[in-house]
Amino acid sequence: MRNCLPMELNLRKGDKVWVEDKDLAWIAADVLDSFDNKLHVETSTGKKVFVSPEKLFRRDPDDEEHNGVDDMTKLTYLHEAGVLYNLQRRYALNDIYTYTGSILIAVNPFKKLPHLYNGHMMEQYMGAPFGELSPHVFAVSDVAYRAMIDDSRSQSILVSGESGAGKTETTKLIMQYLTFVGGRATDDDRSVEQQVLESNPLLEAFGNAKTVRNDNSSRFGKFVEIQFDTNGRISGAAIRTYLLERSRVVRITDPERNYHCFYQLCASGNDAEKYKLSNPRQFHYLNQSKTYELEGVSSAEEYKNTRRAMDIVGISQDEQEGIFRTLAAILHLGNVEFSSGREHDSSVVKDPESRHHLQMAADLFKCDANLLLASLCTRSILTREGIIIKALDPNAAVTSRDTLAKTVYAHLFDWLVDKINKSVGQDPESRFQIGVLDIYGFECFKNNSFEQFCINFANEKLQQHFNEHVFKMEQDEYRKEEINWSYIEFIDNQDVLDLIEKKPIGVIALLDEACMFPRSTHESFSMKLFQNFRFHPRLEKPKFSETDFTLSHYAGKVTYQTEAFLDKNRDYTIVEHCNLLSSSKCPFVAGIFPSAPEESTRSSYKFSSVSSRFKQQLQALMETLSKTEPHYVRCVKPNSLNRPQKFESLSVLHQLRCGGVLEAVRISLAGYPTRRNYSDFVDRFGLLAPEFMDESNDEQALTEKILSKLGLGNYQLGRTKVFLRAGQIGILDSRRAEVLDASARLIQRRLRTFVTHQNFISARASAISIQAYCRGCLSRNAYATRRNAAAAVLVQKHVRRWLSRCAFVKLVSAAIVLQSCIRADSTRLKFSHQKEHRAASLIQAHWRIHKFRSAFRHRQSSIIAIQCRWRQKLAKREFRKLKQVANEAGALRLAKTKLEKRLEDLEWRLQLEKRLRTSGEEAKSSEISKLQKTLESFSLKLDAARLATINECNKNAVLEKQLDISMKEKSAVERELNGMVELKKDNALLKNSMNSLEKKNRVLEKELLNAKTNCNNTLQKLKEAEKRCSELQTSVQSLEEKLSHLENENQVLMQKTLITSPERIGQILGEKHSSAVVPAQNDRRSVFETPTPSKHIMPFSHSLSESRRSKLTAERNLENYELLSRCIKENLGFNDDKPLAACVIYKCLLHWRAFESESTAIFNIIIEGINEALKGGDENGVLPYWLSNASALLCLLQRNLRSNSFLNASAQRSGRAAYGVKSPFKLHGPDDGASHIEARYPALLFKQQLTACVEKIYGLIRDNLKKELSPLLGSCIQAPKASRGIAGKSRSPGGVPQQSPSSQWESILKFLDSLMSRLRENHVPSFFIRKLVTQVFSFINLSLFNSLLLRRECCTFSNGEYVKSGISELEKWIANAKEEFAGTSWHELNYIRQAVGFLVIHQKKKKSLDEIRQDLCPVLTIRQIYRISTMYWDDKYGTQSVSSEVVSQMRVLVDKDNQKQTSNSFLLDDDMSIPFSAEDIDKAIPVLDPSEIEPPKFVSEYTCAQSLVKKPSIASTSKQII
C-alpha cells in the first residue's frame, strides 16, 4: 500500500509524521531537521532517528486533540498509520465501531456494553440514513434491510475476522436487529423470528469450542439466509454450514476444549446419571486438555438454555433424547481402549473398564455390542472369491474408533442443521432475502496445516468479491459526482485462486490425485507441486524444508506444512460403521445414518475429498453472494489476552491486512482518496487565496481558483465535492501551515512592538512612583523622630506620677487592713456569746414540745379505738341494706334483657316490613298501623322502664341520705369521745379489732362502687333503647311521607294526561296495533321511564294498550337520541368560555333521569358519537374541541354523581318526587347545582368510559404534536451551512455567532404558537394546556439530546452555540406563555441545556470530573457525560475536550455502571404515560354551573327538551298542577 503514495519531499522542520516501529507498528514523531535524503525526527518516546522520507507518513496535528473520526474516509491523511491510530483512539473511548466507507470495522471490547444493543437503540437506528448516526452494526443491518425493501433485491452481510474477534456475537446482533424490524407483533415462542434467534445458541453448543485465542470459537462456517415476504416480514430461514472441524471431537490440545455440548451434558445432573456420565475428567475425548470449565460460564445453565432452544426450534423430546444419547455414546466410545490379540495384527478390548464403556456405547446406540466391537477391530474386504475379514492391530482399531466418533458427530451436526431448516421452514414464495455470513477470517500461524489452507482459500474468494464490490462503490461515487475514473485500476487476486483451484493442475487437483493413490505421501505431493508451479509468482519453496510450500495471499505470505494434508483431505467413511448404525433399534440413530445404496457397500471405505467438497460449497456460496448486494463487517481482535482496553497495534494491523480493510484503503488510494465538500474545502483553505473570497459565492469556482493558484493538477471537481489524489492534501496543509506561520510571525511582531511600548510606559510610571515613595519615606522618618521625642517627655511625666501614687495607695491599704482585723476579733467574741444563749433556749423549747406531744398521742390513740368500734357497728348495718339494694338491681337487669330482646325482635320485623313494602300500598298501610300499635306498646314499656329507673334512682338517693346521716352521727360521736379520757383500759382491745374492721370497710366500699357502676350502665342502655325507638318512629314517618308523595305524584301525572288535547288522545287511540315499533327499541324504554304505582294510573292505563304505550316510549327515545346525536355532531361552540355541548348533554341526562336508569343504551350512544366525531374532520380543531367538552362533562359527573345504595335509593326517589311537586323546576329537571345524585351502575360505568375517552383524546393530541414536531427537530439539532457571503464574515475564530435563530427554530416557535392558539380557541382548560406543553418540551429535550449523543457532527462548539441560541428563544416563549400554561416546561429541557452548556464552555481541559458532574451537568449520568466528552470536537477555536485523566476516571465509573442490572443506556426514553387522573381533573378545573347557560335554539325544536328552554311556562304549569 505504501507504494501507492508519492514520496513526500516537502516535509520541513516541525511537521508531524508517523515513523515505522517494530513494537508499535507506527509511532508519532516530529521532524527536527532535513538533510540530503534523510530526515532527522524525534519520536514520542524521545528517541531521535534518521529516516528516509519515503518511509514516513504525514500525521494530522489535530489528531491528538480529536477523539478520532467515525469514518476513515474523513481522515486528512488516509494511510495505514492513520487508520491504525484512529481505531486505537476510538477503542480507548469504547467506540468499538468505525466505518471505512460502507465497511464497518468492529473491535471486540471484551466486556459487556449493554447500552449499545437494547431495544431503544434499535429504534434509533431503524430507518435512519446511513452515516447520520454513530457507527453501529445496527446501521449496517438497517441499510441492508432498507435496500432490500426499496430496491427489491436480496442483500448479504459478510462478517469476517480471526478467532476471538467477535464474529459470532456480531452475527447474533445482526440477526437480532433483522428480527426486530422484520418480526411480527406476537408473543409466540415458536415464531419464525424466535426460532431464527434460538438457532444461534443451539449451533454454538454443537459447533463452538474453546481455542487458544477464544473461549467461544466457531469451528464451522455459517451462512444464514433470512427470507422476507412482500411486506418485509420474516417468512422463513435457512442455514448452511461449511467445513466443520471434525478432528476436534477426538483430538484436542491444552488449553483448548472439545465442543461445548459434551461439557453441558456432563453437567446436566439427572440426565448425566441416566447416560452413566460423570466428571469430564473421566473421558478420553475431554481429558486431553486440563481446561474443563470456562470463566463466568455455568455448563448446567447452558445445558438448560440448549434444551430451551431445542424446544423453541421445534425438536421433539424424543429427538432431544436421541441427540444426547448419541453424545453420551461418543464419550463412552472414546474410553474404549485396545490391546494386541492372540493372532498377529489383531486387537481386543484392553480391560473390563473398556468393556463396560463399549457396552454402554452399544446400549446408547441400541446395537449389539459384539457387532460394534467387530466393526472397530476388523474390516471386511469384498473380492471376487467372496468377503475377506481382516483383523486390525490396536493402533488401527483406535483409528477406526475415532473415525466412528467423528462420523457420528458429523452426521449429528448435519442432522441438527437440517432439522433447524425444516423446523423454521423456507418460504417458496419469498421474493428476496438477507444472508448473513459468519465465516473464519484469514489465518497465519507458526504451523499452518490443511485447515488453514482451506480457510485462506475461502478468504481469497471472499476478498476477490470484496475487491470488486469496493471498486464498484468507488466507481459509483465517481459516476455520481460525474468525474473521469476510467484509468483507475486495482490489483486482482485471480492468479492465486487459479493456482489453488484450477483444473487439472491446481493445488486442490494435485492433492485429490495424491489422495487417490494409497502409496502417495506428502513428499511426493510437494515434489509434484513444485514441478508444476516452479515459476509461479505466488508459490515459493522455503529454504529449510523440502515438503513445505509458501503461498503469497492478499494478506501476506503463508507457509503450509504438508505432513497431514493427505490424511485430512481423505474423508473415509467405513461402510461397516454405517451399516451397523443404520440398523440401530434407536429411531434417531438409524435416522441420521440412512441405508446406503447396494453398489456403495462393495468397498469397506468410501473416499471423499474434503477440499473438493469445500470448493463446491464455496462456489455455491459465491454464486449466492453474486446475486445479492453485499455489506461488510470486519471484526478485529485488539489483543491476544482477551482483556478490555488493551490494544496491540501489530496484531490489529495484521488483522486489518488480513480482513481486507487496508486493501480497501489501497483501492481508495489508487483513485482519489481525499474528498471534501466545497464548503469545507473553502473554509479550510480559503486563506491560501484571500483575494478570491469576496468575488463570488460559488464555492466550486472558489475551489478551482484556489487549486489553480497553487498549481495542483491531481484533482477533479465533482458536483458536490472536490477529489484529490493521495498526497495532495499534504501539500495543501503544508501551504496552509506556511501562510499561518507567516501570519503568526506578523502577529507576533506587532504584538512584541505593542508589548515593548507598554513595558516602557509601565517602567516610566514605575520610576516616578518609586521616587515619590522615597521622598515620602524621608519626610515620614523626620516627623516620626520629632514625635517620638515629645512622646518620651510625656511618658516620663506620667511614670513619675504613677510611682508616687502607687506608694501612697500601699500605705493607705496597710492601715485599713490593721483596723479591719481589730474590729473583726471583737465582733467574733460578741457573736459566740449570742450563739450559746440561743442554743440553750432552743433545747428548752424542744423538750417542752416533746412532753406535750407524747401526752397528746396517748390520748388520741384511745379516741381512735373507740371510733373504730362504733364504725364497725354502723358498717355492718349498712352492709345489710346494700345487699337488699343488690337484689333489686338484679331484677332490673332481667327486665332490661327482656327489653333488649323485644327491641331486636322489633328491628327484625322492621327490616321485614321494608323488604315487603313493594308488595302493595294496602299492605304497607296495614303494616304501618301494626307498627303504630307496636310502637305504643313499646312506649308503655319504655315508660315503665323509665319509672323503674326513677325508682332505682330514688332508692340510691335515700341510701345517700342515710350515708350523710351516719356521717353526721359519726361526727357527733367523735365530739363525745373527746371527753372520754377514762376509757384508756379498752384501747388494747380496740387496736386488735381495728385492722379487721378496716379491711371489711374497704370491701364494702368496693361493692358500693360496683353497684353504682351497674346502675350507670343500665341507664346508658335504656337511653340507647330510647334512641332506637326514636329511629324506628322516624323510619315509619318516612314511609308515611313516601306514600303521600307517591299519591301526589300520581295526581300530577293524572293532571298532565288531562291537559293533553282531546284530538291527540283520539289520534293515539285510533292507531292500529300493527304500527308497533321494533322490539329492540322497546328494550330501551326503561331508560327514561319512572316506575309508578299501578293503582293510581289504572283509569288511564285501561284507555291505552300496551303496544301504544311502547310506541310512544320508542318515539320519545328516538327523539332523545336524535337530540344527543345533533349535539355531538355539530360544533355548538362556547358560551362564556363554557362548552355548550357538555352542558346540554348533562342537562338532558339529568332531566331524563338517565343516571338512575339500569340501561346503558344512551351512554353507549354518547361514547360512540364522540368516537365518531374524533375520526372525522380536522384533527387540529376537533381534538381540542372535544378535549374541552369531554373534560367538562367528566367534571360535572365527578362532582354530582355518587354511588347508590339499597336503603337510600327509595328514600331519595321519594324525596325527589315530593320535592318535585313543591318546586316547579324540580318537576322537569333538577337544578344542576343541587346536591349529589344517587347514580346506578350504568352511570358510574359511563363516567369511567368518559375518563378513558378524555385520556384517549389527550393521547391523540400529544402523539399528533410529536409527529408534527419530529421533522422540525431533525433540522434543529445541527447548525445549517451558512451562505458564502454571510459565512465569509464569520469565518475567523473571533467571529461572533449570530444570535437570531434560524428558520428551523422559527418553525418550532411558530408550531408552539399555533398549538397555544388552537388550544385557547377551543377553551381547553389551562390544566391540560400545561400538561401538553410540558410533554411537548420533554419530547423536544429527548429528541435533541438523543440526536446529540448519536451524531458526532452535532457535538461541536459551533453547533452548541446554535442550539443554545434556539433554546434561549424557547425560554423567551415560555416566559411569554406564563406559568399558567407553560408550567415546568423550562425544567424539562435540563438535559439538552446542560449538554449544550458543556459544549460551549471554554477551557474544558481544566475542568475536573467533580466540577463537570456537580456544576456543569448535575442531571446527566456519567455515561452521558462520557459520551459527550468523547464525541466533542471544537470546529471553531480548535480547543480540546476534557483531559485524559478525567476521561480515564469516567471510563472507570462507566465500567462499574455496566455491572449493574438496571438499564444503562445513555439515551433518554419517551414518556408515553397519561400525566393525570379523573381526580386531578376535578381538582384543577373550576366549578361549572350548567343551569346558567342558555341552550342552543335548536334544542327548543325537541319536545323532550322544551322544559330546558321554557322555564317560565313550566313554572306556571306546575303551579296550576299544585
From Swiss-Prot:
<dbReference type="GO" id="GO:2000769">
    <property type="term" value="P:regulation of establishment or maintenance of cell polarity regulating cell shape"/>
</dbReference>
<dbReference type="GO" id="GO:0031965">
    <property type="term" value="C:nuclear membrane"/>
</dbReference>
<feature type="region of interest" description="Actin-binding">
    <location>
        <begin position="618"/>
        <end position="640"/>
    </location>
</feature>
<feature type="domain" description="IQ 1">
    <location>
        <begin position="763"/>
        <end position="792"/>
    </location>
</feature>
<dbReference type="Pfam" id="PF00612">
    <property type="entry name" value="IQ"/>
</dbReference>
<keyword id="KW-0112">Calmodulin-binding</keyword>
<keyword id="KW-0009">Actin-binding</keyword>
<dbReference type="InterPro" id="IPR036018">
    <property type="entry name" value="MYSc_Myo11"/>
</dbReference>
<dbReference type="GO" id="GO:0005516">
    <property type="term" value="F:calmodulin binding"/>
</dbReference>
<dbReference type="GO" id="GO:0005524">
    <property type="term" value="F:ATP binding"/>
</dbReference>
<dbReference type="GO" id="GO:0007097">
    <property type="term" value="P:nuclear migration"/>
</dbReference>
<feature type="region of interest" description="Actin-binding">
    <location>
        <begin position="593"/>
        <end position="618"/>
    </location>
</feature>
<keyword id="KW-0175">Coiled coil</keyword>
<dbReference type="InterPro" id="IPR036961">
    <property type="entry name" value="Kinesin_motor_dom_sf"/>
</dbReference>
<keyword id="KW-0539">Nucleus</keyword>
<feature type="domain" description="IQ 4">
    <location>
        <begin position="836"/>
        <end position="865"/>
    </location>
</feature>
<dbReference type="GO" id="GO:0007015">
    <property type="term" value="P:actin filament organization"/>
</dbReference>
<keyword id="KW-0963">Cytoplasm</keyword>
<dbReference type="InterPro" id="IPR002710">
    <property type="entry name" value="Dilute_dom"/>
</dbReference>
<dbReference type="InterPro" id="IPR004009">
    <property type="entry name" value="Myosin_N"/>
</dbReference>
<dbReference type="InterPro" id="IPR000048">
    <property type="entry name" value="IQ_motif_EF-hand-BS"/>
</dbReference>
<comment type="similarity">
    <text>Belongs to the TRAFAC class myosin-kinesin ATPase superfamily. Myosin family. Plant myosin class XI subfamily.</text>
</comment>
<feature type="domain" description="Myosin N-terminal SH3-like">
    <location>
        <begin position="12"/>
        <end position="61"/>
    </location>
</feature>
<dbReference type="GO" id="GO:0016459">
    <property type="term" value="C:myosin complex"/>
</dbReference>
<keyword id="KW-0547">Nucleotide-binding</keyword>
<dbReference type="GO" id="GO:0003774">
    <property type="term" value="F:cytoskeletal motor activity"/>
</dbReference>
<keyword id="KW-0472">Membrane</keyword>
<feature type="region of interest" description="Actin-binding">
    <location>
        <begin position="535"/>
        <end position="558"/>
    </location>
</feature>
<feature type="domain" description="IQ 5">
    <location>
        <begin position="859"/>
        <end position="888"/>
    </location>
</feature>
<dbReference type="GO" id="GO:0003779">
    <property type="term" value="F:actin binding"/>
</dbReference>
<feature type="coiled-coil region">
    <location>
        <begin position="889"/>
        <end position="1059"/>
    </location>
</feature>
<keyword id="KW-0677">Repeat</keyword>
<dbReference type="Pfam" id="PF02736">
    <property type="entry name" value="Myosin_N"/>
</dbReference>
<dbReference type="GO" id="GO:0030048">
    <property type="term" value="P:actin filament-based movement"/>
</dbReference>
<keyword id="KW-0505">Motor protein</keyword>
<feature type="domain" description="IQ 3">
    <location>
        <begin position="811"/>
        <end position="840"/>
    </location>
</feature>
<protein>
    <recommendedName>
        <fullName>Myosin-15</fullName>
    </recommendedName>
</protein>
<feature type="binding site">
    <location>
        <begin position="214"/>
        <end position="222"/>
    </location>
    <ligand>
        <name>ATP</name>
    </ligand>
</feature>
<dbReference type="Pfam" id="PF00063">
    <property type="entry name" value="Myosin_head"/>
</dbReference>
<keyword id="KW-0518">Myosin</keyword>
<feature type="binding site">
    <location>
        <begin position="161"/>
        <end position="168"/>
    </location>
    <ligand>
        <name>ATP</name>
    </ligand>
</feature>
<dbReference type="Pfam" id="PF01843">
    <property type="entry name" value="DIL"/>
</dbReference>
